[in-house]
Amino acid sequence: MTAQAALATAANDGELRHDWSAEEIEALFALPFNDLMFEAQKVHRAHFDANRVQVSRLISIKTGSCPEDCSYCPQSAHYATGLEKEKLLAVEEVVESARQAKEEGASRFCMGAAWRGPKGDDFEVAVAMIEGVKALGMETCATFGLLDKWQAQRLKEAGLDYYNHNIDTSPEHYSEVITTRTFQDRLDTLDVVRDAGLHVCSGGIVGLGETRTDRARMIQTLANMPKHPDSVPINLLIPIQGTPLADAERPDSFDFIRTIAVARITMPKSFVRLSAGREGMTEEMQALCFLAGANSVFCGQKLLTAKNAAPGKDKSLFGKLGLQPM
């Protein structure tokens, strides 16, 4: 399969595909950089205003002591990263954070918790948080780990709009990164979320020691879901001392930008989020990511426990590029 053949069937005309082969997607990755950027921008402009970016804020509502062993995560109880465990935040504190985020230009407020999955009273507190944030007129998003059908429906009734559950990497590379839950566990939770009528937010991480084929397989898995994720976060690994990936080699910047572009081409109507890792990117790299089809970012100085681009930097960058928040 040539890249030209793959592009001929890409969704420039509004028809969404769910039958991408790994070979087609690898052919897109292999395009000359300028050609790939041009094609991604064409697809982007067919479905979005290329100069508008959706802005979200993400906070950790419960930090540390997670029982999972995700080898990139400082919140895992399996690793000594020096992260201080924090109990579940109070509802009022979360709602106030959301209010501040709205004042700073965020339209969506995302809440993350270091759980395998929500349980008991903690779940009900999280439900109250969602209700409180929704009352501010913001879109709501949560990432609480594995969900069952009842929990997903309860979150929907509380006013949750989006549920994030990343697949992280390819099915083949997954067990090299995480062993405490399976790739299928993640897909099952996404099915539950979709069936409850929630918008799906799901993407992955570049820099986990994966190959280009792994990146293609990750994109293939996302693009071939029954419905494309409404939001596709593409993260650049932030190496954290104490985790197994602390000394992981930083991916080539152009490989990361290619991943953004291929996600845009294969999932034309999805928001592609330039997610974790922006703090370590130059303005020029971020600009190329927007040119490749990224149209969503997280604002605020932290993403859960990781550093993020400060609001002032984003305002400056948006001004230089002529971008406007949605």
From Swiss-Prot:
**SMART domains listed in its UniProt record:** BATS, Elp3
Q: Which cofactor does it need?
A: [4Fe-4S] cluster; [2Fe-2S] cluster
Summarize where [4Fe-4S] cluster binds, as residue positions.
C66, C70, C73
Name the residues that bind [2Fe-2S] cluster: C110, C141, C201, R273
- Report the top EC class in one word: transferase
Extract the Pfam families matched here. BATS, Radical_SAM
UniProt KW keywords: 2Fe-2S, 4Fe-4S, Biotin biosynthesis, Iron, Iron-sulfur, Metal-binding, S-adenosyl-L-methionine, Transferase
Family (UniProt): Belongs to the radical SAM superfamily. Biotin synthase family.
Q: How does it assemble?
A: Homodimer.
Which protein are we looking at? Biotin synthase
Q: Which gene encodes it?
A: bioB
